[in-house]
């Protein structure tokens, strides 16, 4: 890695820690349901309209049913909005109805916090669909993930006695408070900053401008729209779906180096803050630091692979005498598919950030990365999106691995495993197994179906190892709710829209339900005191055990598939 790459990484991590600490403190207060009176007065009319009482905590099953029902209604609404947009207002470009299969895929994508996009926003979606459908789900899907994390944290924190025994909180109160007091204020501040940098925010009709050189088309059409407001929650909510087809590579979405840095910080802000919130609510800040340390170590390791892989360039160019060395006058390395204004360091770091989190935003085409460089984003997703991960989903995913780690440690020393004073028993381990195995089954089975089916093979534009990698990446992205793509795959077809839509829905909610069941089970248990035989879960030894568990359990499932795709491609390229 170059000195500029190290400097960018250090600046990014330092700024992230400084900003995440106070946000984590506020999230802990919300998780503990310590809401000031003035906030309660603002919330009260919403609860009255909804017919719910925020102080009434729910059993995990009731919490899960409310969550699933809310998200199902959201999916139906977004689907209907796309199908009807041709007859609705705020459609200056005259966009017609989205096809049924694409509308289904997009509705599931945004409700599940995946934001996989098989369409180009500027040529498919009206302003109303973008604002009322997609942007609203950016808020609600993010709030849903944080709410599940809150429920699991409460499961650890509650004593297992009294009226709160077995209860995990009120979904409607969590959803309202997270949206009103976390996501909306942060998004407003970030959107104003983006506007100051040059991100557009308007309802103008598309503009036709004359280019410097005359063209047969007579000019260029510039798409407009309310971009800044959607861009903010796109990053803060680890959503990733771009207003434009080029996503954050588009100058109207990401116009400057400073905006680019803030976008990366925004992606990790809430996942990092939730680690601090977890430590505070659990009554031991060291627990939060341990989880954050494990995430950070794996993230830095990924960055240390992807940046040099891109900086080394393409050996086929080297054989032609092309200068690919980094220097004062050029970025060097593999610049295919990258914005010159960002270069290799920022592009590779952005790719690591958005695939470590379940964001999916891009400033470079991952399909144009070197085989090794492209494998890093794929592996970060296949780990289960627990390296920071999505808002909420990253923390509850990592806590699932933490419970598995203490279970393995308990087997090695012959003690009943416990984490934060709660015994990890047969019921929890069955649910943990389900939560961990859902996504590998979806990814590998979906990939097998796609490479066997004629409709799946028809979408491959690059036969061979890279074509297989494109399919594996698409299923990894969908099932792990990331949303980025190796865009060489033609995925906006009925086959892929259906397959990926199913993977996105199950990858989201077939994990959330067992996590909530674990939360309810833990909340019903007494919290045991710490003894001399208790495994410390806050030191370097446990951090190492946790990282090892994530890598062994999360990654080994995919080694044969990776060997058929990026590994083969890398060996062929560098033979």
From Swiss-Prot:
The keyword tRNA processing does not apply. It comes from the Bacteria. Its main location: membrane. Keywords: Cell inner membrane, Cell membrane, Ion transport, Membrane, Potassium, Potassium transport, Transmembrane, Transmembrane helix, Transport. Belongs to the KdpA family. PANTHER family: POTASSIUM-TRANSPORTING ATPASE A CHAIN (PTHR30607), POTASSIUM-TRANSPORTING ATPASE POTASSIUM-BINDING SUBUNIT (PTHR30607:SF2). NCBIfam families: kdpA (TIGR00680). The system is composed of three essential subunits: KdpA, KdpB and KdpC. This is Potassium-transporting ATPase potassium-binding subunit. The lineage of its organism: Bacteria, Pseudomonadati, Pseudomonadota, Betaproteobacteria, Burkholderiales.
